[in-house]
């Protein structure tokens, strides 16, 4: 259908309000500024100046200018700027950043309301004016863009329509900051050379307080984000100078802000122990599939056109037949040539399509570079570039997401081409979120491999950072500014700087004098102390980054079988736990619950539905009573003090309760008969195999209870420990078949204090169990309780567990006691999360677990000390309670151990001898008591030994010794530096002498033999050696 047939159809209209809508894509303001820098880079500019010009009559008080020396634009190129979405850079093989034809408009409109562009190319000077102020003042809905052009030499207008040119210039003079033609020409003269572009943005966006969003006052050398605190904000989020320094992975353009050069960085050259890993994957297909679809569409259209042209040529040839007139032959030849041309184009498009289809199946390869940022360890994470342009920064992956010190300070760098991942329009994210997550997951796996390869964890993470001056425990604190630490950091990371003339990167040799040196903005190759790289003609040396290998942990068949067995066992335990529990989510579920009642005669009151008031908690003397006489009272954490409640004479039912964590259940208090003691059960389902303790609550804390205990034995109540690990209290009272979970008011309040932040909703769980009515013996209960106590002592042990043929450190967080085995639950300090869970159940005493050395006393936590203090206070509190409540203390009496320990004289003598040896070994040289006198002291004399003076003199002597070592080391370092300088001076003198000698030899040879041609030192050496050989 001809285009003329479409002339009556509706067309999409672009209103000037779209200019604002389009600009909202830039949430990050520096991203809008970077769009204008990207345009200069794509125009092959070698320099861009970003500066502000004060204009108090404009909104914001200044204009923001971007001046580059790129290729510039002619009138046709400038006209394409105002076509939204049109870009000449959009080709599959393009390495340019711009792809969408939208950056200039969206970026400039995000910064201000209006912008004016001046550009020069060849003999033309073009001005482009895009103003929302003009549209608002004139009440125009459509987007109108004045675009006048002048001749660069004569400054005469270049136009076919003088009236149109006059209207365009009149609008510029009226609504732009430049009111006359002379002022406009002055802006053109700011563009150096024959080509370049100047973009000026004015009427800037303001904040709610009326100030501009960009701050150019706080730092005259920088453009900063207004009202952004430096604390907790990455430098690149606050300073445009810092953001521009890392904007490109391989900077080849000088960036000046307010006339001061930005020291751009190649991140891989700024890291300690960089290492590269090659990553290959077939998962990145979205962009490649789009390219294949485009190529197939283009190839299909080209094929149809070629077939149609060939068909026309054949038809014309048949129709002409034997007509051999000149006009007929010319017409036939033209049609045939067109058919041949279209066929060639179709074949080319077909080959492109086939190549893209093959490329779709080929895996994509990326290079991950990791290194440690020893200059600022808190600035870590992944920097992800697209076609050398920064898209995402400080992305945490792999072990960094866990928040520990593992992989802390490590920076990763990757450059992703367009065919792998496509960025969003604002160039602050990637369009395909699924493939981007896959990239981050792969980087996390390689990051864990890098951390293992550099072996920082094996040497000690804290020790490593101390070596570079990170002396504070606060991770975000900067390193020490002492000279020795600065030198240590400078020795590991050589200075890499860009020449201001040739734009090549040079790595400078390490010199002590350059540790705190500031290099000038106009640094050039001739300033390089390296003689091989001290001229711009020398080729740029590529950074030599070691190549790492990503190794997946290969499991043996036995390990796979063992892991599978462990998973099956865990799932079975979860299934059994679910089968034994009934979740209560509503009152209807509670009514359906089958609760068994006891087989007592009906002399007691029947079970009632209405709830009664909760009974008071048990007295502390009963709760803390030991399970056997020789046992010590169980310590209670100092953070949980509790008072002994007053015991009422009315018999009430005691209840114990515990609350689960994240996926835990709340406890249900079922209706019960009054004055009827019940067995209590507290069950926690947060672990697959909770600990078991036996409780005999058959005696209530009331001496007037009408019900008597049939057993004449002394009843012992086991201690219920309050630990973070889940516990389970199982009844041991005879003639009871009913087990229900009820709540204890006091313990529920304590649990709520500890867990109110994590547990908001839960569910009731009632555990139904059936026990034989046979009476359980007290001795069996005591043995189980003792075994459980001994097992509980294992909690907190530091152990090593073998996983996949490697040992990992961890801590015992839970203990499970079985019939014939004790199992530990070990939480690892760090393991690769892709192959090993964060914790694991192991059998105590097996080959896969071993104990670590206990920590030193000074590292004991405050909680341990508080528990120790509680142990001392416990007996006193219990005695006080026993005095206040004689009836209860008669039922459960705690007999103190009054047997005195016999003195072992041999042990005392041995300890005295050990003390003598220690004092003699560390005796200061000038101490008034000699070693001989010390050896003759008895135990009474040692008690009065002046330890304070002893320690003082020892510390003074040790300090003097350290100072002498330090002074000797400093003198040696100075001597070594002086020797090094002397050697370097002698080396330079020798090289100069050698060079003069070679020059003289060449001059001598040229006098002897005029046609000799020697250009390099190597040729001279070879020629002399050849002469000596021939002479022999």
UniProtKB/Swiss-Prot annotation:
Changing residue 730 to A: No effect on phosphorylation by PAK1. Phosphorylated by PAK1 at Ser-739 upon DNA damage. Phosphorylation is required for ATPase activity and recruitment to damaged chromatin. Changing residue 39 to A: Loss of ATP-binding and ATPase activity. Does not homodimerizes. Seems to abolish chromatin compaction. Residues 627-638 have a biased composition (Pro residues). Zn(2+) binds at residues 499, 502, 525, 536. ATP binds at residues 39, 87-89, 99-105, 427. It is found in: Nucleus; Cytoplasm, Cytosol; Chromosome; Nucleus matrix. There is a cross-link at residues 652, 704, 716, 767, 819, 932 (Glycyl lysine isopeptide (Lys-Gly) (interchain with G-Cter in SUMO2)). A zinc finger (CW-type) spans 490-544. It is linked to Charcot-Marie-Tooth disease, axonal, type 2Z: An autosomal dominant, axonal form of Charcot-Marie-Tooth disease, a disorder of the peripheral nervous system, characterized by progressive weakness and atrophy, initially of the peroneal muscles and later of the distal muscles of the arms. Charcot-Marie-Tooth disease is classified in two main groups on the basis of electrophysiologic properties and histopathology: primary peripheral demyelinating neuropathies (designated CMT1 when they are dominantly inherited) and primary peripheral axonal neuropathies (CMT2). Developmental delay, impaired growth, dysmorphic facies, and axonal neuropathy: An autosomal dominant disease characterized by developmental delay, intellectual disability, hypotonia, poor growth, short stature, microcephaly, and variable craniofacial dysmorphism. Patients often present weakness, hyporeflexia, and electrophysiologic abnormalities consistent with an axonal sensorimotor peripheral neuropathy. This is ATPase MORC2. It comes from Homo sapiens (Human). The lineage of its organism: Eukaryota, Metazoa, Chordata, Craniata, Vertebrata.
């Amino acid at each position: 259908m001809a285009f003329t047939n479409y002339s009556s159809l509706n067309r999409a209209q672009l209103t000037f309000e779209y200019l604002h809508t389009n600009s909202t894509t830039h949430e990050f303001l520096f991203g809008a500024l970077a769009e204008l820098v990207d345009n200069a880079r794509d125009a092959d500019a070698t320099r861009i100046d970003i500066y502000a010009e004060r204009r108090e009559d404009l909104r914001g008080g200044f204009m923001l200018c971007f001046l580059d020396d790129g290729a510039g634009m002619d009138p046709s190129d400038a006209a394409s700027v105002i076509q939204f979405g049109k870009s000449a850079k959009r080709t599959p093989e393009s390495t340019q950043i711009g792809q969408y034809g939208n950056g200039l408009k969206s970026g400039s409109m995000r910064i201000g309301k209006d912008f004016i562009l001046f550009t020069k190319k060849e003999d033309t000077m073009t001005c482009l004016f895009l103003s929302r102020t003009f549209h608002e003042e004139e009440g125009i809905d459509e987007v109108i863009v004045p675009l006048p052009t002048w001749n660069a030499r004569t400054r005469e207008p270049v136009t076919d329509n003088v009236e149109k040119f006059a209207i365009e210039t009149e609008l510029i003079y009226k609504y732009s900051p430049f009111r006359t033609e002379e002022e406009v020409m002055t802006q053109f003269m700011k563009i150096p050379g024959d080509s370049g572009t100047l973009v000026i943005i004015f009427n800037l966006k303001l904040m709610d307080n009326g100030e501009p969003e960009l701050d150019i006052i706080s730092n005259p050398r920088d453009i900063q984000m207004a009202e952004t605190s430096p604390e907790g904000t990455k430098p690149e989020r606050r300073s445009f100078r810092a953001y521009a320094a890392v904007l490109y992975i391989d900077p080849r353009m000088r960036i000046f802000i307010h006339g001061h050069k930005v020291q751009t960085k190649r991140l891989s050259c700024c890291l300690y122990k960089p290492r590269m890993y090659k990553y290959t994957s077939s998962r990145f297909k979205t962009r490649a599939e789009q390219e294949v679809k485009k190529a197939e569409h283009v190839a299909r259209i080209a094929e149809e056109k070629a077939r149609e042209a060939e068909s026309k040529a054949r038809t014309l040839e048949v129709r002409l037949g034997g007509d051999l007139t000149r006009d007929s032959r010319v017409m036939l030849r033209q049609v045939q040539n067109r058919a041949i041309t279209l066929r060639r184009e179709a074949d080319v498009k077909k080959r492109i399509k086939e190549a893209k289809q093959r490329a779709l199946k080929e895996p994509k390869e990326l290079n991950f570079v990791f290194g440690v940022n020893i200059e600022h360890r808190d600035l870590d994470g992944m920097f992800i570039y697209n076609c050398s342009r920064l898209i995402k920064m400080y992305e945490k992956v792999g072990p960094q997401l866990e928040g520990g010190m593992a992989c802390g300070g490590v920076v990763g760098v990757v450059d992703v081409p367009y065919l792998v991942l496509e960025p969003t329009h604002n160039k602050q994210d990637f369009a395909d979120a699924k493939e981007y997550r896959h990239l981050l997951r792969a980087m996390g796996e390689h990051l864990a491999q890098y951390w293992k390869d550099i072996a920082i964890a094996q040497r000690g993470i804290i020790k490593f950072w101390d070596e570079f001056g990170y002396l504070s425990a606060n991770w975000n604190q900067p390193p020490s500014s002492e000279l020795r630490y600065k030198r240590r950091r400078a020795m590991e990371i050589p200075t890499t700087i860009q020449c201001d003339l040739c734009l090549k990167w040079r790595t400078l040799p390490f010199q002590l004098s350059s540790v705190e040196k500031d290099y000038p903005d106009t640094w050039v190759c001739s300033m390089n102390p390296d003689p091989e790289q001290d001229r711009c003609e020398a080729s740029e040396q590529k950074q030599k980054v070691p190549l790492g290998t990503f190794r997946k942990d290969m499991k043996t068949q036995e390990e796979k079988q063992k892991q599978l067995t462990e998973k099956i066992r865990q799932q079975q335990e979860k299934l059994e736990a679910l089968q034994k529990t009934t979740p209560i989510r509503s009152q209807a579920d509670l009514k359906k619950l089958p609760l068994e009642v006891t087989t007592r005669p009906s002399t007691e009151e029947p079970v009632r539905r209405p709830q009664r008031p909760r009974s008071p908690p048990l007295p502390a003397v009963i709760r803390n009573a030991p399970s056997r006489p020789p046992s010590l009272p169980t310590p209670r954490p100092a953070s949980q003090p509790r008072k002994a409640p007053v015991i009422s004479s009315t018999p009430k039912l005691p209840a114990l309760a515990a609350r689960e964590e994240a996926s835990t259940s709340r406890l249900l208090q079922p209706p019960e008969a009054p004055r009827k003691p019940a067995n209590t059960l507290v069950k926690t389902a947060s672990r697959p195999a909770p600990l078991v303790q036996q409780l005999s609550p058959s005696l209530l804390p009331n001496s007037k209870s009408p019900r008597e205990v049939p057993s004449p034995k002394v009843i012992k109540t086991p201690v219920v420990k309050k630990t973070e690990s889940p516990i389970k209290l199982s009844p041991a009272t005879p003639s009871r078949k009913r087990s229900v979970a009820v709540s204890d008011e006091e313990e529920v309040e304590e649990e709520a204090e500890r867990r109110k932040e994590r547990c908001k909703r839960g569910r009731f769980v009632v555990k139904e169990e059936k026990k034989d009515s046979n009476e359980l013996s007290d001795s069996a209960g005591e043995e189980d309780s003792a075994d459980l106590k001994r097992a509980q002592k294992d909690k907190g042990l530091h152990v090593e567990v073998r996983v996949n043929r490697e040992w990992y450190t961890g801590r015992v967080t839970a203990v499970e006691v079985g019939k014939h085995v004790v199992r530990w639950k070990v939480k690892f300090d760090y393991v690769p999360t892709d192959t090993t869970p964060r914790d694991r159940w192991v059998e105590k005493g097996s080959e896969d677990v071993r104990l670590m050395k206990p920590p030193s006393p000074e590292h004991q936590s405050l909680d341990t000390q508080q528990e120790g203090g509680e142990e001392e206070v416990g007996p006193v509190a219990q005695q006080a309670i026993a005095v206040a409540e004689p009836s209860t203390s008669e039922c459960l009496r705690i007999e103190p151990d009054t047997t005195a320990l016999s003195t072992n004289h041999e042990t005392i003598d041995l300890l005295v001898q050990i003390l003598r040896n220690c004092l003699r070994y560390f005796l200061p040289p000038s101490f008034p008591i000699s070693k001989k006198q010390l050896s003759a002291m008895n135990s009474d004399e040692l008690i009065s030994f002046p330890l304070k003076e002893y320690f003082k003199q020892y510390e003074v002597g040790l300090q003097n010794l350290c100072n002498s070592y330090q002074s000797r080391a400093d003198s040696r370092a100075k001597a070594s530096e002086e020797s090094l300088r002397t050697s370097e001076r002698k080396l330079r003198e020798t090289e100069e002498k050698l060079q003069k000698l070679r020059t003289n030899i060449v001059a001598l040879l040229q006098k002897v033999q005029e046609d000799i041609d020697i250009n390099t030192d190597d040729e001279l050496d070879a020629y002399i050696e050849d002469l000596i050989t021939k002479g022999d």
